[in-house]
Design a protein with these regions (language model features):
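Short beta-strand element of the alpha/beta-hydrolase
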Residues: 36-45
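C-terminal catalytic histidine-bearing segment of alpha/beta-hydrolase fold enzymes
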Residues: 217-274
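Primarily recognizes the serine-hydrolase "nucleophile elbow" in alpha/beta-hydrolase
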Residues: 95-167, 180, 184
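Catalytic nucleophile-loop/oxyanion-hole region of alpha/beta-hydrolase
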Residues: 52-53, 71-108, 256-258
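Conserved alpha/beta-hydrolase "acid-adjacent" motif
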Residues: 209-218
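N-terminal cap/lid segment of alpha/beta-hydrolase-fold proteins
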Residues: 1-35, 162, 166
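Short beta-strand/loop motif that positions the catalytic acidic residue
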Residues: 196, 202-204, 208
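Short amphipathic alpha-helix adjacent to the substrate-entry channel of hydrolases
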Residues: 34, 53-71
């Protein structure tokens, strides 16, 4: 049986957490079941115009099947998507999770946040913001309260400068939320990265025509120069927005099935860090 509930993080109800997971089993009857579950926060993309269900529930349910307690974040988008609003939404999500560890039986020392496309930008940038004093001040939280153990970035728009330049060059401001229309270092995941940030897992495809491969490779290279613990997987085909990359999200349309192995690789990576 899947338990699902919705927690509003802000008074306007535009940021929320959906809780998805399995009930805790009787310890005496299921000795294999850990008392505390690792946590996965899923942050879907949608160009900061909307939050994609395709990158929310299929990924979340797959994490739940691996024993994770899953939380799906819905954050401010559109004209309300610029810094700092979505990052504050994520900080409130992390705060809620850590403050409710007993309610959900959570291992709050083993939190992974997975973001896709624009959600990958949000997550990658947040991972850098946890080290910035100005973000501590506006969030009311310190680095220890904000930080999580791992982040997973799927075809992420995390390298903001070339993305903002493309949007302005082609005048496609109506195709994205406000955050992507201007550049500022404070909302650039590459510029904010630092030695000691969360462990990073990145996957991408060479033929992605929305977030170019060189933009992601440049971000990963920058992490390596800083000494960040990063793992990078680059697929020959996949395009953009494939979520789980299997029949869970692509039941009829043709797609490069090999990209779906990213989840198996990611779970193996997470296990290696535990």
């Amino acid at each position: 049986m899947i338990i699902s509930e919705k927690i509003y993080l802000t008074e306007d109800k535009k940021a929320s957490l959906e809780v998805i997971g399995l009930p805790m089993f009787d310890q005496s009857r299921s000795a294999w079941q850990a008392e505390e579950r690792p946590v996965a926060v899923i942050v879907p993309g949608g160009s900061y115009l909307y939050c994609s269900d395709r990158e929310a529930y299929p990924v979340g349910l797959t994490f739940a099947s691996k024993g994770y307690q899953v939380f799906i974040l819905r954050y401010h988008v559109g004209d309300e998507s610029d810094y700092p609003r979505p990052f504050l939404d994520l900080s409130l999500a992390v705060k809620y999770i850590k403050e409710n560890k007993e309610k959900y039986k959570l291992d709050i020392n083993n939190i992974t946040i997975a973001g896709f496309s624009a959600g990958g930008h949000l997550v990658g940038t947040y991972a850098g913001l946890v080290n910035r004093k100005e973000f501590h001040e506006i969030s009311g939280m310190d680095q220890d309260q904000l930080k999580v153990k791992n982040i997973i970035l799927g075809y992420p728009a995390v390298n903001l400068k070339p993305i903002a330049e493309k949007i302005n060059h082609y005048n496609i401001h109506d195709k994205v939320g406000k955050l992507f229309t201007t550049y500022d270092e404070i909302k650039d995941g590459k510029a904010l990265a630092y030695n000691g940030m969360a462990n990073v897992f990145v996957f991408h495809s060479i033929d992605d025509d929305m977030v170019y491969v060189n933009e992601v490779a440049d971000y990963v290279h920058h992490l390596t120069t800083l000494g960040v613990n990063v793992e990078f997987h680059l697929f020959n085909q996949g395009g953009h927005g494939y979520s789980t990359g299997n029949k869970f999200t692509n039941p009829k349309e043709g797609f490069p099935t090999r990209v779906g192995v990213w989840m198996d690789i990611a779970f193996d990576w997470l296990d290696s860090l535990s």
